Amino acid sequence: MAMAKGLIFLGAPGSGKGTQAVGLAETLGIPHISTGDMLRQAIADGTELGNQAKGYMDKGELVPDQLILGLIEERLGHKDAKAGWILDGFPRNVNQAIFLDELLVNIGHRTHWVINLKVPDEVIVERLLARGRADDNETTIRNRLLVYTEQTAPLMAYYQEQGKLYSLDGNQPVEAIATNLEKLVKP
């Protein structure tokens, strides 16, 4: 049996990683797995994991890694993920990456590529301010970028050491990024 082709998308808020992950998933015919969407769905469906997650979220706490990994394991067990998958929003730190690697080995999957969309901070600030969300002001955005950079720098180094990290210029037209992604991942 061929091993599933696993892709992880990294990028700061506003980098376009969600847009690109969804587009590439459609092109390749594999699922785009957003941990945020999965959590919301599990809560809406009233699953055991969803109810546990809701308990943490209602208290304003982060959902524990093991709970998220449970959701990911369940999702990767679906038939549509056998040929591959794109994970968006997880892992966010090295501990999560190590847990994820162990989980993937246990279920016969592996990460082939970790794709990082690089976009200058100034461009991200402009993009997020242009969205016009109530909670998006320049100070908040810059703080989120700082936290993101601090959290993900060690994660990038982790995947770089494994030879899996590919950084792409995310400061170009959506179509150009999509073309570059397809060239990278298509055999």
Curated annotation (Swiss-Prot):
GO molecular function: adenylate kinase activity; ATP binding; nucleoside diphosphate kinase activity
Catalytic activity: AMP + ATP = 2 ADP
Region (NMP): 34-63
Pathway: Purine metabolism; AMP biosynthesis via salvage pathway; AMP from ADP: step 1/1
Matches recorded under Pfam families: ADK
Keyword list, A-Z: ATP-binding, Cytoplasm, Kinase, Nucleotide biosynthesis, Nucleotide-binding, Transferase
Keyword flag Ribosomal protein: no
Subcellular location: Cytoplasm
Example GO biological process: AMP salvage
Complex and partners: Monomer.
Function (record text): Catalyzes the reversible transfer of the terminal phosphate group between ATP and AMP. Plays an important role in cellular energy homeostasis and in adenine nucleotide metabolism.
Record family assignment: Belongs to the adenylate kinase family.
HAMAP family assigned to the protein according to its UniProt record, in alphabetical order: Adenylate_kinase_Adk
Notes concerning its domains: Consists of three domains, a large central CORE domain and two small peripheral domains, NMPbind and LID, which undergo movements during catalysis. The LID domain closes over the site of phosphoryl transfer upon ATP binding. Assembling and dissambling the active center during each catalytic cycle provides an effective means to prevent ATP hydrolysis.
Protein's name in the database: Adenylate kinase 1
Naturally occurring in which organism (per UniProt): Synechocystis sp. (strain ATCC 27184 / PCC 6803 / Kazusa)
Gene: adk1
